[in-house]
C-alpha cells in the first residue's frame, strides 16, 4: 500500500530534485538486476524528492510490460525508505494501464504517464488515454506533455477536475504560452515539473512559471553537482547557475547533440566515465562513441563536475 496519498505525494515531489535512473543492462541487453539495484541504492542515498523508475532515461519505451514491472519492483525494494518511487506507464492505453497497475502492485507511490509511442491522436483521445490510466489505479498520476502527446489546457483542466489522483503536469516542450494557460486554469491544484531534455538548461526561467522542480538525467552520474545546481536554481542565484551552465552544462549539450538519441546514451556514457557502468542502450538507440566518452570524461574532469562533492550536512 502506498505511504503517500496522491496530494501528499505532489506536495512532497514539488519541493526537491527528481531522479530518473538509468536501467542497467548486461552485455546481451537483458536487465542487469544486480547493477540496477546498486544504482538505485546509490541514487536514493542522496536527498532527492522522488525516483521515477523505467522513465525516459530508464528506457521505459524499450522495456516489456514484465520488465517494467520488475524494474519498478526492484526500485521500490532497493530505494531508501525516505525516497518515494514512481513507476512509468508507456505505450498504448492497454499497455499503460498494465504498467500503472503493475507499479501499484510493486509498491510504487505514483505513476508518470509517458506519450503513447508514435501514435498521433486528438485532444479527446489524449483525455481518454489519461482518464483510463487515472481510473485504473489509486496512485497519483502525472502526465508528460511532449512530442505526440500535447495536452491542451482544457484537457488538463478537465482531468484535474474529475480525477483527484491526477496530480501533476510534466512539460517537455518549453511552450511558455501553453504552460501559462495551464497554470492559470489549474493553479495549485497540480504541481508542475520541467521535462525538457537536460532540464537544468531551462530550470531558472521555468521556476518563474511555477515549475519548482525538474527531472535531472545528469543526477544519474554526477548527483552532487546536480543537487548543487538545483539549490542554486531554488535560491534564484543566477550568477551561480550561469557559471555551472558555462562550465559544464552547455559543453555537455554539445556532446549530447552530436547524434540523435544521445539524450539517453550520454547518461550511460556518463556513468561509464565516472566508473559506474550501467551497460549500453537498447536499439534503436546507439551508444556514445569512444571519442564521445573520452570528451565527456575530459569535460567532467576540467569542469570539476565529476569531482564536485556536496557538504556532508547537505547530503545527510
Swiss-Prot record:
Its EC number is 4.2.1.41. It comes from Corynebacterium glutamicum (strain ATCC 13032 / DSM 20300 / JCM 1318 / BCRC 11384 / CCUG 27702 / LMG 3730 / NBRC 12168 / NCIMB 10025 / NRRL B-2784 / 534). The lineage of its organism: Bacteria, Bacillati, Actinomycetota, Actinomycetes, Mycobacteriales. It is an enzyme of class 4 (lyase). NCBIfam families: PRK03620.1. GO terms for biological process: D-glucarate catabolic process. It catalyses: 5-dehydro-4-deoxy-D-glucarate + H(+) = 2,5-dioxopentanoate + CO2 + H2O. This is Probable 5-dehydro-4-deoxyglucarate dehydratase. Pathway: Carbohydrate acid metabolism; D-glucarate degradation; 2,5-dioxopentanoate from D-glucarate: step 2/2. Keywords: Lyase. Pfam families: DHDPS (PF00701). CDD domains: KDGDH. GO terms for molecular function: 4-hydroxy-tetrahydrodipicolinate synthase activity; 5-dehydro-4-deoxyglucarate dehydratase activity.
